[in-house]
């Protein structure tokens, strides 16, 4: 009698068996001679305390890859850790009066238990959290090595300052010009900050990203644009009339469009340009203007979105190509001091930002690029700048030239006059890593009045965070700690003070993959790196992934990594999100999916029985309460169902919508698989597969399915692999009442159990045991296929009459062309079209098509 599979009892049992046998512990290279290696890594999580379905999808994908590689004979490293520093822990400390460390480690234990329930094949022996002193101590040692190499330095830099919380805010924490928590207007302040010199690798990072063939093209393009290599001209506009002290030679500007110099109608300085600062010393109005600019966030995006602000300095400069023509000098809030020279020339006709500025302040607009086919006498620029192709006009010696030729000619003219030179610039800026927060990696330096900045000796690392801190007042607890920051200088022994800034948490995640490879063994790191398959969200395309590429190069160059290419991730996959419908009560309150029910095509609130407004399908978020608790899904259906559904319903790079009906369908399929396996005799051994037509057809189905699943996993088409498994199970079940197919069915069940391991490992183990096996299928090899059973001996051809498809025919691959022709003409749907007509010729293209031409 058939039994029912019970995931609630089966899944814990198999997880215990895996852990007892310790089957996911990574083998040392010497213990896996001859085996290829596979380092599979998903972006490690922040320990927020609860998993969400996005986590389930991300880590289920990585587990498919890791389990598949193991079954294919690879030595697999599939680790897990915690990206544990950051602001949420400090916020919890303030709100709940609990130490950030206590809150973080409690969350880690909670999430680890959730991960365990998912049946992930993780090597927990390599687990660490970035807030572990061992980890951040190694990071501090690395910081000092980079500092010795000249890749770390300090400089004054603009930051977003919250005057109420007394802290620096990241750009994303500034909302409409106000602090995200205090609501206070944010100020721009200049603070001395620590920087990593990522620009030292700009060319290498840009050139190498195009060689990452196993990265999504979208991510490679995003990184290339972020690095932003631009060739242009750095030139000096000489003053016409008054020459401010220190700027007697003029104003140096950088432009990527020297072809539009004849269209220049203003020069604009950054509010932080040295000349602006000098002029502001004698102008209260300019001081007030700079203060207004300082209320805007420091990010390019914030500045770009802000209203265009301008201040006329009253100064003018001479146009380099038109004697007697002068150009006014303004200060503009959209000019960045950190890019180029901190000054630009504006050509409103061919740059939208310049045009918006010019229209607001009544500045001239001179078109100098004529679109193809446009009338030079009639062409005008309206509210949109023209940034397309064309040739140069109204530009003296540049007239008639293409844009590229005009750029070269303008640069040559400026260089010949000694007014500037062609130059390459980058959008990429050095990475500011100072954070005025407690819960982060302490920067391992001390400040001595006599010796300056002194690195902490290696013997004194890690510089540990003090435990006795309070969060009852705003600001950095390290700054106001009575003892921690006071220390003797390691060089001269005199009283000094510790650096109280901590490192940006992106530093923690920029080298963790190397720590997973080995804590300290350079040979083991060389063996495992680069990561063979990295999996995570596309939102990390620029910052995390770019910083990691910088760090791996820097670590290589200070002798920490034997990684000639400098690339940390050979393959990258960016998965889509898990989405869900949104629900609102009649009063407009967001409702959780568990708070609503469907009846007769309508949705009602369970508590009140009132109708619910069903909103858009969106990314799961706490704010809109459209989240599904993985623990609840596991408790109801089992982990295999959760894993199966998030992988089955959509290509992995696209979003997947979580639905109750989808989960129920996955649960039914689990029972369908079990009912097939359980239909086999309980005692073996099973007979060898028969050679009758039905058994042979079933064996072909078995072997073709394995080949298709194998290929789909390799190509990250997990949903296709799952679709193949569905079809395969259907084929197997159709023959379960035929005694002659027992051998072929038993072969199929054995292969199916092995192929289910990457997707539904608990069910796979139960099926394996039901087949009489005493080992763990998670340690079994991938099924071997018989090539002769995978190759079709028939082929299906399209049959056309006068080029129009009328039918199709399946014939033996080696059937003679004249026999194919005769069979095609005999098809009813073909015979009716050629009856009574003269067949002029018949074209048979082997393996593809039959075309009958009639008159």
Swiss-Prot record:
Q: Which GO terms describe its molecular function?
A: aminoacyl-tRNA deacylase activity; ATP binding; leucine-tRNA ligase activity
Please tell me one Gene Ontology term that the record gives under cellular component.
Answer: cytosol
Transmembrane annotation, as ranges? none
Q: Where found in the cell? A: Cytoplasm
Q: Which gene encodes it?
A: leuS
- Segments carrying motif 'KMSKS' region: 619-623
Q: Which SUPFAM superfamilies match?
A: Anticodon-binding domain of a subclass of class I aminoacyl-tRNA synthetases (SSF47323), Nucleotidylyl transferase (SSF52374), ValRS/IleRS/LeuRS editing domain (SSF50677)
Q: What is this protein called?
A: Leucine--tRNA ligase
| Pfam families named in the record | Anticodon_1, tRNA-synt_1, tRNA-synt_1_2, tRNA-synt_1g
Identify the EC number(s): 6.1.1.4
Please indicate which superkingdom the organism of origin belongs to.
Answer: Bacteria
Major location (coarse): cytoplasm
Q: Which residues bind ATP?
A: 622
Motif segment ('HIGH' region): 45-55
Catalytic activity entry: tRNA(Leu) + L-leucine + ATP = L-leucyl-tRNA(Leu) + AMP + diphosphate
The species is Hyphomonas neptunium (strain ATCC 15444)
Q: Which PANTHER family match?
A: LEUCINE--TRNA LIGASE, MITOCHONDRIAL, LEUCYL-TRNA SYNTHETASE
What the record says about family reads: Belongs to the class-I aminoacyl-tRNA synthetase family.
| Example GO BP | leucyl-tRNA aminoacylation
State whether keyword Cytoplasm applies: yes
Keywords for this protein? Aminoacyl-tRNA synthetase, ATP-binding, Cytoplasm, Ligase, Nucleotide-binding, Protein biosynthesis
């Amino acid at each position: 009698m058939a039994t029912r599979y019970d995931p609630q009892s089966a899944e814990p049992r198999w997880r215990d068996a895996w852990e007892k046998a310790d089957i996911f512990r990574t083998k040392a290279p010497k213990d896996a001679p001859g085996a290829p290696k596979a380092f599979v890594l998903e972006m490690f999580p922040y320990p927020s305390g609860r998993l969400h379905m996005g986590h389930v999808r991300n880590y289920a994908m990585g587990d498919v890859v890791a389990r598949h590689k193991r079954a294919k004979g690879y030595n697999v490293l599939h680790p897990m850790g915690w990206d544990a520093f950051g602001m949420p822990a400090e916020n919890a400390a303030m709100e709940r009066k609990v130490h950030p460390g206590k809150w973080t480690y409690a969350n880690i234990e909670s999430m680890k238990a959730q991960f365990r329930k998912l049946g992930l094949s993780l090597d927990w022996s390599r687990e660490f959290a970035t807030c572990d002193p061992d980890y951040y101590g190694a990071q501090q040692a690395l910081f000092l090595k980079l500092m010795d190499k000249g890749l770390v330095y300090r400089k004054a830099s603009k930051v977003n300052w919250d005057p109420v919380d007394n802290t620096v805010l990241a750009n994303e924490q500034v909302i409409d010009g106000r602090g995200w928590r205090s609501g206070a207007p944010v100020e721009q302040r200049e603070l001395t900050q620590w920087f990593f010199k990522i620009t030292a690798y700009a060319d290498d990072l840009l050139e190498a990203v195009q060689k990452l063939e196993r990265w999504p093209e979208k991510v490679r393009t995003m990184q290339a644009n972020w690095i932003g290599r631009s060739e242009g001209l750095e030139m000096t506009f000489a003053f016409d009339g008054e020459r401010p002290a220190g700027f007697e030679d003029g104003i140096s500007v950088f432009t990527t469009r020297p072809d539009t110099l004849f269209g220049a109608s203003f020069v604009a300085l950054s509010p932080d340009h040295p000349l602006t600062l000098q002029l502001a010393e004698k102008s209260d109005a300019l001081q007030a203007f700079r203060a207004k600019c300082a209320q805007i966030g420091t990010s390019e995006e914030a500045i770009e979105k802000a209203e265009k602000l301008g201040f006329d300095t009253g100064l003018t400069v001479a146009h380099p190509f038109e004697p007697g023509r002068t150009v006014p000098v303004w200060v503009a809030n959209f000019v960045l001091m950190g890019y180029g020279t901190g000054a630009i020339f504006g050509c409103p006709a061919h740059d939208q930002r310049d045009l918006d500025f010019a229209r607001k302040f009544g500045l001239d607009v001179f078109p100098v690029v004529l679109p193809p086919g446009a009338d030079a006498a009639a062409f005008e620029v309206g509210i949109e700048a023209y940034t397309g192709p064309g040739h140069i006009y109204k530009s003296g010696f540049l007239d008639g030239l293409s844009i590229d030729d005009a750029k070269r000619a303008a640069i040559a003219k400026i260089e010949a006059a000694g007014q500037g030179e062609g130059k390459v610039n980058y959008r990429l800026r050095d990475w500011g890593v100072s954070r005025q927060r407690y819960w982060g990696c302490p920067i391992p330096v001390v400040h001595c009045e006599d010796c300056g900045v002194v690195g902490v000796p290696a013997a004194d690392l890690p510089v540990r965070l003090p435990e006795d801190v309070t969060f009852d007042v705003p600001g950095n607890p390290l700054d106001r700690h009575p003892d921690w920051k006071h220390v003797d200088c390691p060089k001269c022994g005199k009283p000094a003070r510790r650096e109280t800034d901590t490192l940006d948490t992106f530093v923690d995640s920029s080298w963790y993959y190397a720590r997973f490879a080995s804590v300290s063994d350079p040979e083991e790191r060389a063996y495992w790196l680069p990561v063979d398959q990295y999996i995570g969200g596309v939102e990390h395309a620029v910052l995390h992934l770019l910083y990691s590429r910088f760090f791996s190069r820097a670590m290589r160059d200070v002798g920490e990594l034997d990684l000639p290419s400098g690339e940390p991730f050979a393959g990258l996959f960016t998965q889509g999100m898990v989405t869900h419908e949104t629900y609102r009560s009649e009063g407009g309150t967001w409702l959780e999916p568990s708070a609503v029910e469907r009846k007769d095509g309508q949705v009602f609130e369970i508590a009140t029985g009132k109708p619910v407004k069903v909103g858009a399908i969106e990314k799961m978020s706490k704010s809109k309460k459209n989240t599904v608790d993985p623990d609840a899904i596991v408790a109801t259906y089992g982990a295999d169902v959760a894993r199966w559904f998030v992988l089955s319903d959509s290509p992995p790079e696209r979003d997947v919508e979580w639905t109750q009906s989808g989960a129920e369908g996955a649960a039914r399929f689990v029972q369908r698989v079990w009912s097939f396996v359980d239909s086999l005799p309980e005692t073996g051994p099973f007979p060898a597969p028969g050679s009758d037509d039905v058994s042979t057809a079933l064996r072909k189905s078995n072997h073709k399915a394995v080949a298709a699943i194998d290929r789909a996993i390799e190509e990250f088409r997990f949903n296709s692999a799952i679709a193949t498994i569905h079809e395969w199970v259907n084929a197997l079940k159709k023959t379960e009442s035929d005694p002659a197919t027992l051998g072929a069915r038993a072969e199929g069940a054995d292969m199916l159990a092995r192929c289910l391991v990457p997707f539904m490992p608990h069910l796979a183990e139960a099926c394996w045991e039901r087949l009489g096996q005493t080992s763990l299928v998670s340690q079994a090899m991938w099924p071997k296929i018989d090539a002769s059973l995978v190759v079709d001996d028939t082929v299906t051809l399209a049959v056309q009459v006068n080029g129009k498809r009328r039918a199709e025919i399946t014939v033996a691959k080696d059937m003679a062309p004249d026999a194919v022709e005769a069979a095609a003409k005999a098809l009813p749907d073909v015979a009716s079209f050629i009856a009574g007509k003269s067949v002029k010729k018949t074209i048979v293209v082997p393996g593809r098509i039959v075309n009958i031409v009639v008159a």
